[in-house]
């Protein structure tokens, strides 16, 4: 098994990015990318701008791509620029720079249309579906569609250019790392199904960097009592 150590991390200033830097920083040599100056060393790149992306991944063995508009309510314009164009530019830079593996932050929302919901962040707790990766996607938002685009672009680059691709359909991770913060709110049942702890997020990305695969999709949620994905 090839071990990758020089890792690019886009969207490093987001919740997941900070969790990974804290949890994996001693194991990997990270090059962090952000859109603006932050309180840790980073390279500023807008990934929807080709001129800024070119050369960004030189010397890297793998990239964890988190940068995107993360909101299920995101507008088409934002999704188009940050999630679609950004994904294309990241894949092209992986190809140009010889990056071996891309770990892509996809989302649980790619299959939310298989549940009864009123908004992308509510679930009907009376409907129990163990959704599986081999089922057709059923996105609930433009955001979810953009993540399916990323998964399929990853498949194309895996087949055509040999890029190893791991797409993680991530649940709901919060900075507080405490699902009880949603108790009594409309999002409580959603959180009980989708919560992803910091510990499990770190372990999932470690395994995504290490697993022997050419192309892989995986659910990434904690062992929640009300989970709707077949783990």
Enumerate the language-model features and the residues they cover:
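N-terminal Rossmann NAD(P)H-binding glycine-rich loop of SDR-like oxidoreductase domains
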Residues: 4-26
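Active-site helix of classical SDR
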Residues: 142-149
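Rossmann-fold cofactor-recognition segment
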Residues: 35-50
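NAD(P)H-binding glycine-rich loop region in Rossmannoid oxidoreductase-like domains
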Residues: 46-82, 93
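Conserved C-terminal active-site "lid" loop/helix of NAD(P)H-dependent oxidoreductases
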Residues: 182-183, 217-218, 223-231
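Conserved Rossmann-fold NAD(P)-dependent oxidoreductase catalytic core, especially the SDR/UDP-sugar
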Residues: 89-140
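Conserved beta-loop-beta element that borders a ligand/cofactor-binding pocket
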Residues: 151-176
């Amino acid at each position: 098994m090839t071990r990758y150590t020089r890792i690019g991390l886009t969207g490093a200033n987001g919740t997941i990015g900070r969790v990974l830097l804290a949890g994996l920083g001693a194991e990997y040599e990270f090059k962090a990318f952000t859109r603006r100056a932050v309180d840790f060393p980073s390279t500023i790149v807008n990934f929807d701008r080709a001129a800024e992306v070119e050369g960004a991944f030189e010397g890297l063995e793998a990239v964890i791509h988190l940068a995107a508009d993360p909101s299920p309510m995101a507008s088409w314009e934002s999704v188009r620029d940050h999630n679609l164009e950004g994904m294309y530019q990241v894949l092209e830079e992986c190809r140009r720079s010889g990056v071996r593996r891309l770990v892509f932050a996809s989302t649980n929302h790619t299959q939310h249309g298989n549940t009864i919901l009123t908004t992308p962040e509510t679930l009907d707790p009376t409907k129990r579906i163990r959704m599986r990766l081999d089922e057709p996607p059923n996105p609930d938002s433009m955001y979810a569609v953009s993540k399916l685009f990323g998964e399929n672009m990853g498949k194309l680059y895996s087949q055509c250019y040999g890029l190893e691709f791991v797409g993680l359909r991530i649940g709901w991770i919060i900075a507080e790392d405490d699902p009880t913060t949603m108790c009594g709110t409309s999002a409580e049942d959603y959180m009980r199904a989708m919560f992803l702890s910091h510990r499990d997020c770190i372990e999932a990305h470690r395994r995504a960097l290490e697993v022997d695969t050419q192309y892989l999709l995986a659910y990434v949620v904690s062992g929640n009592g009300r989970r709707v994905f077949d783990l």
